[in-house]
């Protein structure tokens, strides 16, 4: 008997619950449809944005690959320079193509030509490519014996401490520039800082050797 009563009680509770849900749905039917529609719309928009971003990354990757391939080919096929020039004229990969052209001429020791491309690279965003261009500017200035300019470039990089670029490379460029200018004490200090902060890197090891040689010359 008690089991039957409990069974009926559960049925009544279930019926009450279902009735409450039906009443709730009827009372807030419009609001529920609006919320559901908003959720569906948001899901569609999110999916669309993800698809667009994926497509953009794919296009960007292909464009970067094209620039990289051309940069590798121009050493053997100088005629490809014209194709790289076209990519440097504008578009997604203009900065990268311009940097590759600057590198090409720097490797040929045509510092003026390299500089003519480096000045075309925008001052931002301050990403890896930006600091690669700044480093190359420092190398070109050092090769042209414009030591003050080189020191200024490398000091700016080291002061900014960018996460996008290896600080040991910038410190090494700074120390080289100071050494070339004859600022021996400053160069030794920079080499020693590099050695202390980056002992396990190539530049840290090279800095220890150069600092030792400069100490002997003093």
Spans of features found by a protein language model:
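Acidic, polar-rich low-complexity tracts and alpha-helical solenoid repeat scaffolds
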Residues: 1-218
């Amino acid at each position: 008997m008690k089991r039957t009563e409990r069974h009926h009680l559960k049925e009544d509770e279930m019926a009450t619950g279902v009735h409450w849900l039906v009443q709730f749905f009827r009372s807030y039917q419009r609001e529920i449809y609006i919320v559901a529609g908003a959720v569906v719309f948001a899901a569609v928009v999110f999916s669309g944005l993800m698809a667009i971003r994926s497509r953009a990354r794919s296009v960007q990757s292909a464009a970067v690959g094209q620039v990289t391939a051309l940069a590798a080919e121009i050493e053997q096929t100088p005629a490809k320079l014209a194709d790289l020039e076209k990519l440097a004229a504008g578009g997604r990969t203009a900065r990268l193509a311009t940097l590759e052209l600057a590198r090409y001429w720097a490797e040929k020791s045509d510092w003026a030509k390299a500089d003519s491309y480096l000045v075309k690279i925008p001052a931002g965003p301050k990403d890896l490519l930006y600091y690669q261009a700044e480093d190359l500017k420092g190398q070109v200035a050092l090769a042209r014996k414009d030591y003050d300019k080189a020191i200024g470039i490398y000091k700016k990089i080291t002061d900014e401490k960018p996460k996008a670029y290896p600080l040991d490379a910038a410190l090494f460029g700074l120390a080289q520039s100071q050494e070339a200018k004859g600022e021996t004490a400053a160069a030794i200090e920079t080499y020693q800082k590099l050695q202390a902060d980056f002992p396990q890197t190539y530049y840290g090891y090279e800095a220890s050797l150069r600092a030792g040689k400069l100490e002997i010359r003093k």
